[in-house]
């Protein structure tokens, strides 16, 4: 078999590797091996699995360097440790989200392309976000993944360039989920009060997190919908990983609602990934993420010029652009009639 054929075959079978890792996560294998190596017999007993089948299941995990095996004893390697919930930089929640809520709908991609329908809605009777409201299990999986991703967002370099920490008095995080992002902003803007705006089903998780972060005296949760009127009087608004969930018309509605609530000296910080303006070979992961978002909820990742078009139609304009880690960007946006106020931006 030549190299090209081998690469193609490996890609074709990529789905099986994803299901292998997801199944190992669901079975609790990574947790069971996190602290110590174990014999396959003991591991099978602890997990209530057939020993022979478990050994066969573990072999590709060894070959893929997620663990090592010696004399039927298995031990996690660094790649496997990252898929355990005990790891500080764990990808477990992302893997569970992918396995439970993303992978099943990719099988509908061909039909969706032909019918111009969202793959998720070819299977389910409601939209993805309607399911979040009505099905607590789906919300838990999605919220855990988003919380872990937001906690890992590194904003230190951005804050290091800001000189306005004493001027910002009120921060409004629109669609702020459990509050992980606004917690980072309130740590820097020490004189500010915060408000997280999100739907009713998010409230309990958000209030628990705000208390955990020790900012519940400075930050409150307010039930709201970014497709409706947004509270006014914010010096700084946050919109983190929201726009990519929506097609252009809906995204313009969200931005326009925020723009209407902004004062002439207010600013909006948007956190999103940016696609290259031209197709680049090293950006395949971004293009696949773009398709994954469409598969789930009909949204899309965008280029900077596509964002600029949305802002133009919403009465907004880019003030500054800050690269963050792993393809994330922080986009500072202001109203077209922005009026400079000392200390803000």
Where do the protein language model's features map onto the residues?
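Alpha-helical subdomain
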Residues: 1-69, 89, 165-345
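Conserved Class I S-adenosyl-L-methionine-dependent methyltransferase catalytic core
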Residues: 2-37, 45-48, 52-169
